[in-house]
């Protein structure tokens, strides 16, 4: 196929350079958005009198025909098309003849591709938000069933204080909500229309940019044509938000991997979401969370590549921008697939080992802080109480017993203010229930949080 720009040149492209230069192998993914943008552009050209209404109707009918052909696999790109825009134009001209050549009036591929990518990403952000909500619901259902289930809480991966398992799971719901809020914020800046900026300076024709933007569901237009065709901030913002999503679910994935190990044994992996070893017949491997954890670095890499691509570009459009799409496309797929995999894992891939959890929270010194709090209630300054309990823990370790195993006499030898009620205060259930501050793991506080999230997420289940 002859290039649209070939009249300027005396020689054809080197075949390898033609392939190297082309983006059609990956940007054909934008076919729907390219057709949407072209239909809106044709309507605008008719509204402003640049083409007739009859011509616009014919263009729209032909573009819809191309959409149908693409959906049926009948319209396929060719390497000579260079990109999705030229592929559509080639087919349009083959259908309409000279009329097809009018569509690109007052438009450049520079503003066209920016429009296509924004339309595509806007839809994908909405898709990812749905997957985030589904994962929140899966976490909520696990949390709702485990309000009274206790799990060790850790700092530095050392046992710290016991928690309600529901409280632990709700922490991830909070993270995912921040992710959703960030995506909504990014979407606002994705939803600005560059169409009409043309190559870089605008056009001398009497176009109506606001009309086109409205047709495509954009909330506003770019105020500066140079910025319109050269802005890829939205790809960086999206990939940064996606990186945080992956960070959060990678943390959850890593915990599940630990919990599923024999050393922890907090969860049992089901056959539905596990694989085995080709050599060791006893193995059941947590491949799903491991893959999610591994794919996180892939998204981080895309963020870095986009930042590096943009950092040295003069205004306005540069061919470097062709490299933005694969990074964005793969980020979307990776995030969406990872969220879906984690949701399935929570729904049917793991079961909490309640007996093991109970055994674990009863077999450590994570109730030591509550002994200090008990002494504070007896008017002993906290730092002094802290030091007393440190000595008590050391004594227990030497005797190979737990705090609950100390006799009342031994307690009172430590401090005469300690009474028999100390035993009730340091049971794991009482330790958790005592955390009554807002946002704490106390059962009443967690019950309130569950109710809040039930109201927030209920619409998804309808």
From Swiss-Prot:
SUPFAM superfamilies: L-aspartase-like (SSF48557)
GO CC annotations, alphabetized: cytosol
GO molecular function, one term: argininosuccinate lyase activity
InterPro entries reported in the protein's UniProt record: Arg_succ_lyase_C, Argininosuccinate_lyase, Fumarase/histidase_N, Fumarate_lyase_CS, Fumarate_lyase_fam, Fumarate_lyase_N, L-Aspartase-like
Residues spanning the membrane: none
The reaction(s) this protein catalyses: 2-(N(omega)-L-arginino)succinate = fumarate + L-arginine
Keywords: Amino-acid biosynthesis, Arginine biosynthesis, Cytoplasm, Lyase
A GO BP entry: L-arginine biosynthetic process
Highest taxon of source: Bacteria
Pathway involvement of the protein, from the record: Amino-acid biosynthesis; L-arginine biosynthesis; L-arginine from L-ornithine and carbamoyl phosphate: step 3/3
EC number(s) from the headed UniProt entry: 4.3.2.1
Enzyme class label: lyase
Localisation per UniProt entry: Cytoplasm
Pfam families in alphabetical order: ASL_C2, Lyase_1
Similarity-based family: Belongs to the lyase 1 family. Argininosuccinate lyase subfamily.
Protein name stated in the entry: Argininosuccinate lyase
Gene that encodes the chain: argH
């Amino acid at each position: 196929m002859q290039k649209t720009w070939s009249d300027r040149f005396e020689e054809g492209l080197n075949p390898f350079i033609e392939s190297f230069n082309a983006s059609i192998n990956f940007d054909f993914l934008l076919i729907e958005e390219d057709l949407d943008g072209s239909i809106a552009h044709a309507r605008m050209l008719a509204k402003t009198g640049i083409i007739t209404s009859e011509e616009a109707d014919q263009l729209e009918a032909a573009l819809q025909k191309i959409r149908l052909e693409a959906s049926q696999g009948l319209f396929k790109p060719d390497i000579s098309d260079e990109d999705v825009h030229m592929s559509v134009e080639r087919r349009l001209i083959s259908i309409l003849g000279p009329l097809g050549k009018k569509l690109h009036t007052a438009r450049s591929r520079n503003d066209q591709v920016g429009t296509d990518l924004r339309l595509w990403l806007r839809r994908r952000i909405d898709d990812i938000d749905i997957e985030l909500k589904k994962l929140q619901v899966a976490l909520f259902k696990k949390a709702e069933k485990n309000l009274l289930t206790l799990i060790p809480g850790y700092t530095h991966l050392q046992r710290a204080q016991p928690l309600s398992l529901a409280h632990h799971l709700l922490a991830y719901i909070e993270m995912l909500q921040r992710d959703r809020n960030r995506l909504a914020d990014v979407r606002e800046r994705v939803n600005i229309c560059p169409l009409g900026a043309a190559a870089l300076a605008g056009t001398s024709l009497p176009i109506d940019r606001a009309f086109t933007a409205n047709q495509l569901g954009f909330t506003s237009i770019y105020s500066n044509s140079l910025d319109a065709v050269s802005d890829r901030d939205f790809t960086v913002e999206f990939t940064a938000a996606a990186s945080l999503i992956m960070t959060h679910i990678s943390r959850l994935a890593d915990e599940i991997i630990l919990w599923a190990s024999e050393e922890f044994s907090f969860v049992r992996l089901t056959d539905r979401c596990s694989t085995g070893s080709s050599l060791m017949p006893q193995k059941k491997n947590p491949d799903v969370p491991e893959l999610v954890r591994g794919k996180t670095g892939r998204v981080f890499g895309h963020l870095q590549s986009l930042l590096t691509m943009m950092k040295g570009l003069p205004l306005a459009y540069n061919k470097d921008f062709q490299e933005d799409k694969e990074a964005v496309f793969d980020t979307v797929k990776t995030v969406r697939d990872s969220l879906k995999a984690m949701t399935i894992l929570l729904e049917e891939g793991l079961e909490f080992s309640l007996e093991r959890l109970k055994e674990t929270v009863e077999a450590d010194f994570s109730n030591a802080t509550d002994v200090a709090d008990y002494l504070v209630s007896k008017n002993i300054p906290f730092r002094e109480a802290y030091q007393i309990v440190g000595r008590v823990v050391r004594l227990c370790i030497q005797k190979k017993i737990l705090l609950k195993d100390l006799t009342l006499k031994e307690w009172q030898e430590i401090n005469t203010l300690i009474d028999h009620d100390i035993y009730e205060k340091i049971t794991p259930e009482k330790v958790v229930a005592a955390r009554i501050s807002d946002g704490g793991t106390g059962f009443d506080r967690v019950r309130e949080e569950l109710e809040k999230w039930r109201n927030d997420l209920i619409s998804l289940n309808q």
